[in-house]
């Protein structure tokens, strides 16, 4: 199922004629079930090496979504944990870090916003020996800004990077997905974060 039930649009992601097979019951060890499935499919025992797509001739210049992604991927330490709620601004960081040092990437799986900073707190509390990087969009960061206080109070090893575009960029996309092609000034103002501007 898709995470939003858009009026007049299909919510099922799989084709209607697809046969859905249950791999394992809740009481079954999921790792064992996945291993047996991999054996049945003759899947490789080790994951494929991911090609490093990071440009090698990167030069300093204007900070953009693309250059931020390159910088993050180049400076990310081994075994980092990334809490990614960067919305429309963080795609380059995900793409370029795929071939970088070993790390874990935690990202939103549904349609809610506001989980990025609390997830970073949880990761840092659970894994105090690992660097946590919070990639956070400015709009969704406002939902749980109190997590910044918790990070400071608990002296957590979290690098927080705010991707600031002064907009609920992801909600603008969702507006178009429900068929609103020419939103009025009131609708646009609800998704604009520049009046007043956020001084992160």
Give residue spans per PLM region.
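Phosphate/pyrophosphate-binding active-site segments
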Residues: 2-88, 186
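Thiamine diphosphate
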Residues: 25-36, 92-200
